[in-house]
Structures are given as C-alpha cells and as structure tokens.
Amino acid sequence: MTTKILPSQPKVGMVSLGCPKALVDSERILTKLRADGYGLSPDYAGADVVLVNTCGFLDSAKEESLEAIGEAMAENGRVIVTGCMGKEADVIRARFPNVLAVTGAHQYEQVVEAVHDAAPPTQGPFVDLVPEGGLKLTPRHYSYLKISEGCNHSCAFCIIPDLRGKLVSRRIDAVLREAEKLVAAGTKELLVISQDTSAYGVDIRHDPRQWHGREIRAHMTDLARELGQLRTSEGRAPWVRLHYVYPYPHVDAVIPLMAEGLLTPYLDIPFQHASPSVLKRMKRPANEAKVLERLKSWRAIAPDIAIRSSFVVGFPGETEADFQYLLDWLEEAQLDRVGAFRFEPVAGAQANALPEPVPDEVKEERYQRIMAKTAAISAAKLEAKIGRTLPVIIDEVGEADEDGSIGATGRSQADAPEIDGHVYLRDVAATLKAGDIVDVEIEDADEHDLFGVVT
C-alpha cells in the first residue's frame, strides 16, 4: 500500500498596521486564506508571501507603512500591499516596483486573488481549519466587532471618506451572528468599532431583520441591547464597549443600558476640540456647552460611566484663547481618558488650505499643556477609586517570583485594550488566566493605572 504525500501548504505572513478597523480587515483576510488551505507564518523566513496592511491617515503613518513594506521586501521579497495606503499605488510602486500587488482598503477578494496568484493553494478549501469565530489577531478573550465601513462626515482634517468611502452598514443579523460566534468561541469582551458608530444603519434606513424570532432594527441602541443579552459559556454577559460614538442626541438612549448592566459603562467619543471657532473650521458640530449638560445627565444615570476622547491641538487658526477654552472645558468635563495629537497636514485634507498655520513649537507647547491637564484629572479620578472593589478582566498573568508570588495585568471597565490604562494585581492564584473576570480591591493609583488585589 502506498501513501500519498500531500504537497505542503503555502504559508502567508501578515504585517497589520493602523487602527482596530484595519486589524479586523486583516483578520477577515487571514480567515479566508486559512479556509483556502494556507498556513500562517510568524516570521518572514517561513512565508511564501507577505501581506502588509497599511495605514494612510497621516503622513507619519504613511511613512511607517512604507518602512514596513521595505522591511518585508528586504526580508522576504514577495510582498502584497493592501489597506488604506493602497489608494496611493503609484507612490508605493515608485519606491518598491517589485511588490506583487497593491489593493485598497477592505478589498478582501482582490487580496485573496493576489495571494492565489503569488502562491497557489495546493488543495481545496479547508473550512475546518477556521475557528468558529474566524481567525483573530487579538487575544482570545476580546474581539473587535466592526459594524460598518466608511463615513458620511467631511471633517476638514480627515481623508477617511476618500480612503474608505461613504458609510456602508452591515446587516444587523450578520453583526449579531458574528458576535454570537465570537462569544461562543471564548470572547469575554466585544469592542464595537466603525468610523461612526452612532450613524450605524442610517444608510440602510435602519433595515430591520429577524433575529431569534424577533425583528431587530439596524440601529446603535437596538444593537447594543441585543449584544448585552449574549452569554458566555459560563453564563455571564460579555463586556460590550462602544467606540467612535459621535454625540448625536440618540446616544442618550444607550446610557440606561449601562445602568441596567447590558452595556459596559464606557463611551469613546471623538470630540476633537471644544472651541466653537476651531470646531467650525474643522467642520465639526459645535455644541460643546450642550455636551457638558449631557455628560452630567449621563453620570446621573450611570455614575460609573467612563468617557474617553481625543483632541487635536495646533489646528490652523487655533489661538491661545481657543486653546485655553479647550483646557477650561476639559476641567469642567472631567473626562476619564484623553488622547491628544498635534495637528499634522494630511495629503488631500481640506485643512491644508486653511490660513494661519500654528508653528510647530507652539503645537508642542500646547500638546504638553493638554497632556499635563488631562493627566492631573486622570490622577484625581483614579485616586478616588482607591478602596473600591471593581470587576477586572485579566489580560496577562506573569511568572512566579523567587518567593513564589505571581502578578497579573488586567483592565477595569473604564479601560479599553491598547489605548487606556491597566490594573496591576499582586499575589494572584496560579490558576488565574487571561480572560478571567475577577473582583479586585483597589489599593493604589497613579495618573494612568490602578493597583490592587483579587478579593
């Protein structure tokens, strides 16, 4: 009897850059390739072809993408480029004429076809190689859930609509089906992402679909309520975290879901600035006073709600008075987590044509001031948590010290992965593992992180 020797499966390497939405794109591409029989390589040497999923939002991000392409070309030589910078194929090919293919953002089929051309699959589809929740590039216990693509806004500093197009919402039943599979596969935390989560379903007129015998609208509030009713294998509700939430009036409706425990008390809202004149030049909504009133009302309903936001300093025309207005607004708003960015011109953005550019040294000085302001606010808010007992999801468990003690790193409900703070735990049990959710007594705090012990 002879044994048929099957040809080895071609292997694909992946370099994923940019935002969580791009990471989801990478996961979908790899899931399809795995189903087509491809193996995954953790390094350049073992890959038959390397995919580089690029970011093209800022010039600095473009340069990082070009450097990543250059490294992949030097280390492997067989490279396919995809992602947001794929829109600038001429720039990529001018610098790297030997790349095998260049495709744009979320062009999954074109990427897969390019891989097939570069390293043909040796066998037919192997759907059984794909986990129930698809391939993931995040730890098993948390997953990004992308609900739409593109954006209908025309912010002066942004080129996302040019890179990713207008808003295209996924069907509500498709989103819920994916979420259900992720939770069944071990996900304990769902991070809902898009370019504009609040606008979910607008483009499809909130098209209702049947889900487990009920009609559910494609609307952020309806989606949040349904996600909050999912259950893990232990019978617990997963943490559900909303990102990129524009403060439209209907956002008020999700706050009671937080009070009911259906939604993690956390909102990521891209305010960008507070000065009405700067917001007008940015082509952003200028209702900062109303926002302060709403923040107070949200906190009255869900006292533990954490608000994260990001701000741009040094936007063209920003005066010292504008910047001081922002600092005063932040003092009153008392946001929990804040990211700040120095304005950077982006090729194709409307802001490039605005007069009165802010000098780089002024941008830097304002950046340092806003970071100092928000760090002080964060330190005070975290100090107020000392003595409380909070639920914490474990991200990593360390090795035992010489005395046998083990430490761990986790996050509270106020902390999203990668962008917010941590909770550092001492003297944890050897049985503790990533993905466990435990009650932690907070013993100490600094301006970013909490420190505690499992109760």
From Swiss-Prot:
Record-level GO BP terms: tRNA modification
NCBIfam families for this protein: 30S ribosomal protein S12 methylthiotransferase RimO, MiaB/RimO family radical SAM methylthiotransferase
Assigned EC number: 2.8.4.4
Protein name listed in UniProt: Ribosomal protein uS12 methylthiotransferase RimO
Organism: Sphingopyxis alaskensis (strain DSM 13593 / LMG 18877 / RB2256) (Sphingomonas alaskensis)
Keyword annotations: 4Fe-4S, Cytoplasm, Iron, Iron-sulfur, Metal-binding, S-adenosyl-L-methionine, Transferase
Ranges for domain MTTase N-terminal: 10-120
Enzyme class (EC, first level): transferase
Keyword Iron-sulfur included in the entry's annotation: yes
Disulfide bridges in this chain: none
UniProt cofactor note: Binds 2 [4Fe-4S] clusters. One cluster is coordinated with 3 cysteines and an exchangeable S-adenosyl-L-methionine.
